[in-house]
Curated annotation (Swiss-Prot):
Keyword annotations from UniProtKB, A to Z: Bacterial flagellum biogenesis, Phosphoprotein
Gene: yvyG
Organism: Bacillus subtilis (strain 168)
Protein name: Uncharacterized protein YvyG
GO biological process, one term: bacterial-type flagellum assembly
Record InterPro entries: FlgN-like, FlgN-like_sf
Signal peptide (from-to): none
Length: 160
């Protein structure tokens, strides 16, 4: 069996991940600029790419399993070891390319996570500063009325 189907799926995965990387970089700029509508559109597009990546990856796993004879080690490295010639070189190049794109995507997503966390912290702090605290430390009739009668101290006990 030829590794052509695996090569085609890896090419598709590389393209999809590169598009996802571009969207993640756009998301970084939208987060920095505070553009919520643009961010919402980007998230919708990201979901579509994630679904396509998931489907392609499932297909790749099935194809890899069939190519390797349904072994437990259904990895691209195992496919590279089983192939030779131009297919082997192409698989190695695609593997390296996909690894690099995934590494960059991981870094960009980590930065986006940090930007989102910082924005949420800022919103939380701003909200806490604008909203008054519920605890009122002033004396009032309501506090006096809540005290039980037995806890009142008397200076002079007339029954003694």
């Amino acid at each position: 069996m030829s590794a052509k189907a695996i090569i085609e799926q890896l090419k598709r995965l590389c393209v999809l991940h590169e598009h996802l990387l571009t969207l993640s970089e756009e998301k970084t700029e939208a987060l920095k600029a505070g553009k919520t509508k643009e961010l919402s559109n980007i998230l919708t597009k990201e979901q579509k790419y994630i679904q396509a990546i998931t489907q392609t990856e499932d297909d790749r796993i099935k194809t890899t399993s069939a190519f390797l004879g349904y072994s437990e080690n259904n990895t691209i490295s195992a496919c590279i070891a089983k192939t030779s010639g131009s297919e082997k070189e192409e698989l190695e190049q695609l593997y390296e390319s996909l690894s690099q794109v995934l590494g960059r995507l991981k870094k960009v997503n980590e930065m986006n996570r940090q930007l989102t966390r910082d924005a949420l912290q800022f919103i939380s702090i701003s909200y806490d500063m604008l909203v008054p605290k519920e605890n009122n430390f002033n004396y009032s009739k309501s506090i006096k009325a809540e005290l039980p009668k037995s806890s009142k101290m008397k200076l002079f006990d007339s029954k003694a």
